[in-house]
Amino acid sequence: MNKDVSQHTPMMQQYLQLKAQHPDILLFYRMGDFYELFYEDAKKAAVLLDISLTKRGASAGEPIPMAGVPYHAVEGYLAKLVALGESVAICEQIGEVGASKGPVERKVVRIVTPGTVSDEALLPERQDNLVAAICEQKGVFAIATLDMTSGRFLISELANKTALMAELQRVMPAEILYPEDFAYIPMLNNYKGLRRRPCWEFELVTAIQLLNRQFGTQCLDGFGVQQAKVALCAAGCVLHYAQETQRTALPHINSIHLSQDSEMVLLDAATRRNLELTQNLAGGTEATLASVLDKCVTPMGSRLLKRWIHQPIRQLDILKSRQDMIATLQQYEQIEPLQPLLRNVGDMERILARIALRSARPRDLTRLRTALAQLPLIAKCTQNLGACLAVLLSKNADFSELYTLLEQAIIETPPQLIRDGGVIAEGYHAELDEWRTLSAGATQYLDNLEIRERESTGIDTLKIGFNAVQGYYIQISQAQAHKAPIHYVRRQTLKNAERYIIPELKTYEDKVLKAKGAALALEKQLYEQLFDLIMPHLGALQQTAMALSELDVLVNLAERAESLHYVRPSFSLQRGINIKAGRHPVVEHVMVEPFIANTVFLNSQRHLLIVTGPNMGGKSTYMRQTALICLMAYIGSFVPAESAEIGVIDRIFTRIGASDDLASGRSTFMVEMTEMANILHQATAQSVVLIDEIGRGTSTYDGLALACACAEWLANKTQSLTLFATHYFELTSLPSQLKGVANVHLDACEYNDTIAFMHSVQEGAASKSYGLAVAALAGVPKQVIALAKQRLVHLEEFSQQTKMAQQHPQADLLFTVEMPEEEKMAPLAKAESAVELALRAITPDELTPRQALDELYRLKKLLSSS
């Protein structure tokens, strides 16, 4: 692109000047009915949007690459770009064509970015859409997140980069802002929407001034965030970015909240992944905890429930209050009456954000009107449901005047866009009604004029029409065109007709178009005034939306508890978990056969269980269900069990499954050890820890030694509430050596080389692992199973002979066994020949003489070929 803009046409000079202000993002440049892109933007958009790349003449002697999208379809293209992590500057024509010399005046009116979009078509309906800013100062990491669609503004400070990554994994922002001098950029490689920002945007003084100006305060003490200085730096950056992209006031962003670890049950990234809270291991949303629990009838309720799932809390008073409300809703049978009313509330939270940004569409206002109409009905349903629900719904103000305003101002079913007109209701504004009457009278006038002209000219094919290009016209068929009077001025010739204009029709056309234009301009003005009239109610409306979303979640959890037979858990201030007949909430939901419930009991005297049993026996399910039941209790939900008493929990850790990290060059074993190291460093006596088969990725003795050492550390040092699944039967001796350790196993029965899994947890260690039986079930060839059994006998007979293993620790255990000499010389497994396989497949009694002869020839041929 030529930097000397003077060599370009005036229009391209204007484009280049605007593009220079937004060099790193796509510029949608409005030209008539299209948004055009030029140069590198055009090439990039052509690839991303699968649109044609063309050329627009030449400027400065070079052809200009160009691509474009129709203005009326722009939302679909923006949605695709946002999903790809791209940002777009929208440049509109703000001047009148021909109003001044040179190109029509244009300016960038908004910037659409993945983290700050508010348009309904560009947003995931039931997921939060966040922009985050991160920074680090003197070893303190911080993150600030802003939800532009609700005004929710949160900050937190973190002890290390691992905690920061866990927080990013939790909130999954659509955009991440970081300072130019950020030293940890490589750890962000897996995220889209990365934006490097100048360091001055992270300065503390600048941030505090910006935040005070936004909130209309003199200091931030009232928000309790004044001590979180690093987090405030991040908050300043994210607020500046929001103002820069929206280019309008942000009245719905009116507070900021500091999240503290002491209020939460902490979950690291591995735990969220392994427990499949909102995303399964394959990356989908099926068979997750959220897929079972989330039957909310409003999108804002669904988003709130997912936030609860990802951030369980430790404040017992809030948890018990939620439980009380769920129990009350069940007791008074108000679930079924409330859900249809809440469904009509819709996504009030995001509608209010669009109103605050003055980007709400007419149908947003009708949805708000519908939501307000539900409030008296919801209040009536809940008026006798106890103090807790009364406190929740006390946030609802009286919006009867606002409802009346919207009822009078907006028609019942308005068009999608204000530019289409016909949004403001008749009777709302006298002048608008006058302009509309003048415009509407055109139909009768034109009918009368058509009849009069037919009679005066004698042309029976004469008719009056209108189109956007030609305006009003008189049309006469070609066969009768010669009869047109002399004062008819030809406007257009068609194949079968001629079109004319007369002075009277032209005068009326000007009058009607003026009336339509005046009506539309006044309607847009009145529509903007509606935003001004709603704005004083915005804070109260936001509080009401929050209350309704919480009510939706609680009604939903009450319905889930009732439908799925969940019980109310109790909380204890003592350390421990006592779950009677617990069930995995997801597995039982997808199973056809009945789920086998199991009990888990952990306390200060019994805090580590060695879990043994066969593969597929249910060890992982048992462990995960324990963690999920604890998590469900700590969001205020009822749980799948006969009874559950949950003690104080500060964190939940999991080390389950095997996966490598090729992008970072880490093997499966390295990933496993990294996760284990995090647990050993961070776990406390109040943590719940799930360990599944640690030590598999290295030599047998190394793995056994690591597993034993980790179990001892968890038993003696951290004394966490731990479920430790293993196939190393040597670990089952730990209860006799360590305090607080016990054995449990998943039961199974073996009969005639087949295995039946009981999925029942029993006290004591398993008798064997049944690995060969499971391999047979998986379809491993019988010859391989037979060979494995043979080798297993020798391994068991000579397992005490470890001399070679001690001399060569990494040697395969199979070759540490002294086998009889004749078996050393024997082939591992003689494969059956083609002839033998063919013979085995023949059933002689079923063959006719002719078939038998054919088979004999086939066998002889096979023998010759082999």
Swiss-Prot record:
Keywords: ATP-binding, DNA damage, DNA repair, DNA-binding, Nucleotide-binding. Disulfide bonds: none annotated. InterPro entries: DNA_mismatch_repair_MutS, DNA_mismatch_repair_MutS-lik_N, DNA_mismatch_repair_MutS/MSH, DNA_mismatch_repair_MutS_C, DNA_mismatch_repair_MutS_clamp, DNA_mismatch_repair_MutS_core, DNA_mismatch_repair_MutS_N, DNA_mismatch_repair_MutS_sf. SUPFAM superfamilies: DNA repair protein MutS, domain I, DNA repair protein MutS, domain II, DNA repair protein MutS, domain III, P-loop containing nucleoside triphosphate hydrolases. One of its GO terms (molecular function) is ATP binding. PROSITE patterns: DNA_MISMATCH_REPAIR_2. The keyword Nucleotide-binding applies. Gene3D superfamilies: 1.10.1420.10, 6.10.140.430, DNA repair protein MutS, domain I, MutS, connector domain, P-loop containing nucleotide triphosphate hydrolases. It comes from the Bacteria. Pfam families: MutS_I, MutS_II, MutS_III, MutS_IV, MutS_V. The keyword Signal does not apply. ATP binds at residues 613-620. One of its GO terms (cellular component) is cytosol. This protein is involved in the repair of mismatches in DNA. It is possible that it carries out the mismatch recognition step. This protein has a weak ATPase activity. Belongs to the DNA mismatch repair MutS family. This is DNA mismatch repair protein MutS. It comes from Haemophilus ducreyi (strain 35000HP / ATCC 700724). The gene is mutS.
